[in-house]
Amino acid sequence: MVTRRRSKKKKKTKRKKQSSKEKEKYQTFINLPCDLLQLVISRLPLKDNIRASAVCKTWHEACVSLRVIHTSPWLIYFSKTDDSYELYDPSMQKNCNLHFPELSGFRVCYSKDGWLLMYNPNSYQLLFFNPFTRDCVPMPTLWMAYDQRMAFSCAPTSTSCLLFTVTSVTWNYITIKTYFANAKEWKTSVFKNRLQRNFNTFEQIVFSNGVFYCLTNTGCLALFDPSLNYWNVLPGRPPKRPGSNGCFMTEHQGEIFLIYMYRHMNPTVLKLDLTSFEWAERKTLGGLTIYASALSSESRAEQQKQSGIWNCLCLSVFHGFKRTCIYYKVDEESEVCFKWKKQNPYENIWIMPPLNLIDLPLFDHRI
């Protein structure tokens, strides 16, 4: 009987020692120094951040304070041969491969508010597509040329969503087509052509402050105000150095930015004065990060200054056989010569992921 009691006491003491060790280990993780805890949590993706916030009160407060609400755009790549797509998150350097059979034969035209505008050149079919929810909103058919640009004002779920494109440019006239969501047909407007004769095509279209800004390949900027059905060509041109092989135009909180790219020179950053409608060269992006692609670009006032994602131009590149992104620092101290090669505009485009991404099935397939 004595030996049994002793063995039971030994087992209890062992269990107490084990439980005390586990508690010490648990307490060690909970009582991490504040700066170390924030450093660890700052490197977690949103999904793991939410999980970590359930550990204890201290972790919850740290996770919530560092949780990124305004996520960075993702880059979506389109296959030339099949219906496979690749989504790439540059902030976490993660990607996922997707298949959308319903988009077979379609090419991308524009991206805004988490939606893609897709066009089928064989059937002339237009549709809005959300790659995160797979929601699809069909539009009336419209013939489009290969290099024709199209844009829309906001998500198609809004009644104020407006599609815009220039369908024809002759010596005397320019034809514009617009379409409001839930309308029955396209609206056609014809204006006198005031563009210069060396005009070839529109390269960039941006919607801001209720107006569509349209940039031609020669640098002319035209405005279309849908509320007034008014078309105007501005007289000035942006300062452009010889040797430019492409440009990107975007907006941020009503301000219009234009970036000219060069093969063997650093980019030129310009900002439009909305009072005089003249372009002014800038040596900095003012803290913005511009995610640039040929058909549409995104801009964000990034908060990750300590990580270097600040005052940058983010571009899609091929590194070896891997698709990735590079950040080019735009400021007065930038002395590194940036070499950029123009890509096929229909290969990729930036898109904003939804804030409830964690609740979608797509989130669990990220690798």
From Swiss-Prot:
Name of this protein: F-box protein At3g56470
Residue ranges, annotated region (Disordered): 1-24
The organism's taxonomic lineage, starting at the top: Eukaryota, Viridiplantae, Streptophyta, Embryophyta, Tracheophyta
Record's compositionally biased regions (Basic residues): 1-18
Alphabetical list of Pfam families matching this protein: Beta-prop_KIB1-4 (PF03478), F-box (PF00646)
PANTHER family cross-referenced by the UniProt entry: BNAA09G35900D PROTEIN, TRANSMEMBRANE PROTEIN
Source domain of life: Eukaryota
Record domain F-box: where: 26-81
Alphabetical list of InterPro entries matching this protein: F-box-like_dom_sf (IPR036047), F-box_dom (IPR001810), Gal_Oxase/kelch_b-propeller (IPR011043), KIB1-4_b-propeller (IPR005174)
